Regions:
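Active-site anion-handling motifs in enzyme catalytic cores
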Residues: 1-242
Length: 242
């Protein structure tokens, strides 16, 4: 079977790329061919070895027998109502093309009242698997049948490596107060003789953090394999959602 995966792929976000890597590995291990919708199909082909099509090409939905929407946090309109419109349109169009669709290990929300109505309508008759208990309870309140799964990135095997750094700080959307606290904590650990690695996970979006931590060791990566390698080396990890 050809299985398509639609999500926030091709934008060099390490968390989303880890999700795609994990989903593709599991499906391929079961004998399925995997294709992906991507904001940068060339990069997705190079990074993951998958057939990839531009996410704005509706005819790409004809290239798979089944489409998985996810994982990640796609079903929300707190950051953008346009983003929610896009993902719900992918679901509707795939069904119009008579393709099977599954909402796969997503989180759900936050949603505006208008967004709740749109999601409830779009998911009628669609199998829904959610990655956390809060999302599952939210779905039940909305009257959306759903099952509990987990974040696909947890399926990626950690590499066997010796530990080197004592702290890894992935960052996404850090507020000023939290950033100051992290900086103080990092300096304290350095004074204790620890090695500190500041890991920036979406190149181009972390300039503020790079400036604050400019005296520390910094690495920028959107490669999930590199992220796993560095995290496996760490004695401690301080992290936020990606």
């Amino acid at each position: 079977m050809v299985v398509g995966v639609a999500g926030y792929y091709g934008f060099r976000n390490a968390g989303d790329e880890a999700i795609l890597e994990a989903i593709a590995r599991e499906l391929q291990a079961r004998g399925h061919e995997v294709v992906a919708l991507s904001g940068d199909p060339k990069r997705t082909r190079e990074d993951h070895g998958l057939r990839a099509y531009h996410r704005l090409n509706p005819l790409a939905l004809l290239r798979a027998d089944l489409w998985l929407l996810g994982g990640g946090g796609l079903l929300q309109d707190a950051t953008s109502a346009l983003s929610l419109t896009y993902y719900l349109s992918v679901l509707r169009l795939a069904r119009l093309f008579r393709k099977r669709v599954v909402v796969f290990n997503q989180s759900l929300g936050p949603l505006s009242p208008w967004g709740e109505r749109r999601v409830r309508k779009a998911l009628q008759g669609v199998p829904v698997i959610l990655r956390d208990q809060d999302s599952l309870e939210y779905a039940r309140r909305l009257g959306i049948p759903a099952a509990l799964g987990a974040d696909p990135a947890l399926l990626l095997p950690p590499p066997p490596v010796p530990r080197e750094a004592d702290l890894v700080i992935p960052r996404a959307g850090v507020q000023e107060e939290a950033l100051t606290t992290l900086y103080v904590a990092a300096n304290h650990l350095v004074h204790e003789g620890k090695q500190v690695l500041v890991l920036l996970l979406q190149p181009g979006y972390d300039d503020e953090v790079a400036e604050v931590f400019r005296l520390h060791r910094i690495e920028r990566t959107s490669d999930p394999r590199r992220l796993l390698y560095l995290a496996a080396q760490a004695g401690y990890v301080i992290s936020m959602r990606l």
